[in-house]
Amino acid sequence: MDSYAIYPSLKDKVVFVTGGATGIGESIVTHFCRQGSKVAFVDINAPAGEKLRAGLAAEVGNAPEFLRCSVIDTDALQATIRDVQERLGVIRVLVNNAANDDRHSIESVTAQYWDERMAVNLRHQFFAAQAVIPGMQQAGGGSIINFGSLSWKVGMGGMPAYVTAKAAIGGLTRGLARDVGKFNIRVNTVVPGWVMTDRQIRLWLDAEGERTMDRMQSLAGRIVPDDLARMVLFLAADDSRMCSAQEFVVDAGWA
């Protein structure tokens, strides 16, 4: 256990995380379990999801629930959310983390690929929120945390569909926040910089990438998944009760 903040308001709170089996999502699930929250998470990577569930059961005795589900399948996602709420109680925290940042060129994008990128990076965030808002409203409030990206803010090339989807999340967050604020539901966006997940390191980090981070980040060092998870904990907890419709950037001072 680390020496960072403990949030009493998160104990026993029902939390739902998309894309929770690996990377940033894995860290988010882990940190909520350590806070004593009741966590359910979905992912398409069943082996990784089961491994995380078992590992946390052994580590903290507070095993999350893992359910294999593709966020692209809207009906299945909303059915999974209903199932979780029937068994665990009202979801008070939704973390829309699932995404796919595969690189792609302008000329390679088809209409089908474009729609798939919107589905995996944007569409599910709205429909997951749609599914949890009625319960949050009835319970007296909640926190919806969407994940954006630094990529569109800095004009990153090589993945136009991804950048478009992530740019739209800021508008989604602000629109939802205005609509549901009267129910004491907060909606915010977390904007990561270049986070050193296993996937990023394996696929894209090279010497030039290291030099770019050294040049562009105001802070030395590297962003790791736990840095994002700690921001998510704050936005989920009552400590951020008057924070809504905002972007919280964790980029080491890049943008």
For each feature predicted by the language model, list its residue ranges:
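Residue(s) in the substrate-gating loop at a strand-loop-helix junction
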Residues: S149
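Active-site helix of classical SDR
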Residues: A129, A165, T173
